[in-house]
Amino acid sequence: MLPVIIAGAGPVGLALALALSRHGVPSVVLDGSDEGVVRRAARTCVLPPDVAHWARLPGLVEETTTWTGWRTTVRGKVVEEAVFTEERSPIHLPQHALEEALWRAVGRTGLVELLSPARLVDLEQHESGVTAHLKETPAGDSPSRRGSHLVGCDGARSTVRKLLGVAFPGRTAVERYAVAALRGGVPDTGEAALHRALPAPRRTGGARAEPPEVLVRPLAGGTVRLDWPLPPEENPVTPDALLERVERTLVGLNDGELPPHELLDTGVYACHQRLARWWRSGRVLLAGDAAHLVGALGTQQVAEGLRDVDNLAWKLAADRRPGGAEGLLESYAEERRGAVGARLRAVDQALPVIRGRGGRGGRLTGRGRLTLPADAHLGRGALGEPGRYAIPGQRDRTAEGGPLLGNPVTDVAVTALDGERGRLVDRLGGPLLLVLTAPGARVWDARHWLSAGLMPDLAGAVAALPLPAELLVTDAYPGAPAHTLLVVRPDGRLAAALPGADRRALERCVGDLTDLPVG
């Protein structure tokens, strides 16, 4: 069995290798970096609920933190507050911790071969797969590798993208930030916060310092990350200027006093807006930084890359089955490029509103301008929602008020046919999930309902589907009446809500969804 070749051993490349292994698909990861995992306390990532499962890797829990809530303040006055439940809170963690956990996880699969150093220099496509030509391969290794597909997860300067001749249009440095990670010094409320026009101390001589804007995001272990947007015309930030910014911010957050603190890391980074013109050429695809760059106004590049992984892995697995699934691979490019493109447009529209840099931003007033900067952090609106995919062959809703298709599934308690109980989101990333709403299912002994009502026929229908699927039962699902069969894609998107007794509707749905013959 030919493996999938993955160019790039960053978080997206490693996550894709791990996701493919869960479908039984082998992969070869080409690590062209000489650095290994770079440990930077100020380089972190925020994972929204739809990709939070990546923070549950073994050994990673102690490196993560969830926030109890959110506050937006302007000149010290709270203009917006939100409370997070543990299930709906974003997860914040150092990026190096995520990468190290992924390295450990792929090493345990037995299905992932890591080549390091291994630099891709050329690729060839043929009818049965792809050949990758390599440079600087490990001693004794072949200078070329064959695979069923090749996925470029090799960063913003992607070799794969360049070999395909794919344009990467967009804008450079739409925002610049200074950033610091420190231990102590910030009141430990458990909340993340955006402070705009933070009250600042007076300079020597009585003049008040320019009030800064700062984003405060707690990390595990009593550490915190601070981000300050920089004016586009500002000169390079010196270490002394950054230290002054840290101290001025801490004084503003602590009623005029500078508390004890330990500065762990500092830096300056730029946010770019770019989108590859196309993401697929035959058996070669792009994902992560190779396909898109986001990050302004709190949008999360790592999270978008992990959404690429969740969307692509099961489709690659399906395309390797007899007959292939050409339509599924094309849907990856359509769905993910469309979602990221919408995010980039939202940032372009919001930047002048929030920063007041020309256009209508300087004239816009009211509460919307005060709360818009929090949208990406709260998973709200075009800046923050995970995006919705159009589902082939399905209407938007099964009925008025029914569950909205194409969105991330709502997590509910489920029971498997073997009686095992758990949460729906914990079963994502593997087979297609078929969830029957059956009031009282958690109360009854599974031995009684497994052979009753719709279950025997449904179990037979599931066994006849052209790709692996698992039948689950839940008491209820928001918006779905009793005896509704919910079709949940491996990436956690709700694909259909069907009458539980309609086997033909299920077969049509799966055929439309997978591009594979059914029945």
Model-flagged regions — what are they?
Residues 39-107:
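Active-site-adjacent segment of FAD-dependent monooxygenases/related oxidoreductases
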Residues 116-130:
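A conserved short coil-to-beta-strand element within the FAD-binding core of flavoproteins
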Residues 21-42:
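Glycine-rich FAD pyrophosphate-binding loop
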Residues 139-149:
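Core beta-strand elements of the Rossmann-like FAD/NAD(P) dinucleotide-binding domain
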Residues 13-14:
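N-terminal Rossmann-fold NAD(P) dinucleotide-binding loop
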Residues 237-304, 339, 343-346:
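FAD/FMN-dependent oxidoreductases across multiple families
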Residues 149, 153-271:
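Conserved FAD-binding catalytic core of PHBH/FMO-like flavoproteins
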Residues 2-3, 7, 18-23, 32, ...:
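Helical substrate-recognition/capping region of FAD-dependent monooxygenase/halogenase enzymes
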